[in-house]
Structures are given as C-alpha cells and as structure tokens.
Amino acid sequence: MRMLLGSFAVYAAAALCEIGGCYAWWCWRRAGAGAWVLLPGMASLALFGWLLTLVDSDTAGRTFAAYGGIYIVGAIVWLRLVEGRPVTLRDAAGVAICLAGAAIILSAGRGAER
C-alpha cells in the first residue's frame, strides 16, 4: 500500500509538471503570453520526465499507461481550477473509465507478465 501511495504522489506531481509545462506553451502560442513563459514551461516538462523515472516499475510502457489515468484527472482538475470551466458529466464519466483502466494496470504490479 505504501508503494502505491508513493507512486500516486509521483504521478500527481508529474501530472502537475506536464500540464503546467504544456499550458505554458498553450499560453504562448494561443493566448498571447510572452516567450519568457516557455522557460519555466520547458523546466516543468523536464521535471515531469524525471519524476516518471522514480516510479517503482519494471517497464516504462506500463508506468506511462498507468500515469495516463492520473494525468487525465489532473487535466480535468486544471480545467476547473485554472481555466475556470465547468466539469461536465461526460468529463466525469471519461475520468472514471480512465481511472478504472489505470487501476487495472497498476494492480498487476511488478513482474506481472502473464
């Protein structure tokens, strides 16, 4: 259980870094922000990549797949808290489906190649 909570914390931090880094590019390209926002954005994306290497997993692909569910939750939370947009029923249903998939992948654990 402790390892699962640790992985969740790393995934949540990685999601914040990835979403924040991508949002910097979005702000520069689509919202008219100055190019200076790209510097913290790139640093955030580099930190995102490093964080995923901290997850206790035998395979990168399984790590990235499980992370995807957490990323989607983070993106919807970002939508609400940062962009101020409402979360729709379809958003919530999509999150639930993705979390179920991530839970299945995470429950396999290490060495679950069968």
Curated annotation (Swiss-Prot):
Pfam families (UniProt xref): UPF0060 (PF02694)
UniProt entry keywords in alphabetical sequence: Cell inner membrane, Cell membrane, Membrane, Transmembrane, Transmembrane helix
Entry keyword rRNA processing: no
Annotated transmembrane regions: 8-28, 35-55, 64-84, 92-112
Membrane topology of this protein: Multi-pass membrane protein
Signal peptide extent: none
Subcellular location field: Cell inner membrane
Disulfide bonds: none
Gene Ontology, cellular component aspect: plasma membrane
NCBIfam families listed in its UniProt record: PRK02237.1
Family (UniProt): Belongs to the UPF0060 family.
HAMAP family: UPF0060
Protein's name according to its UniProt entry: UPF0060 membrane protein GDI3492/Gdia_2889
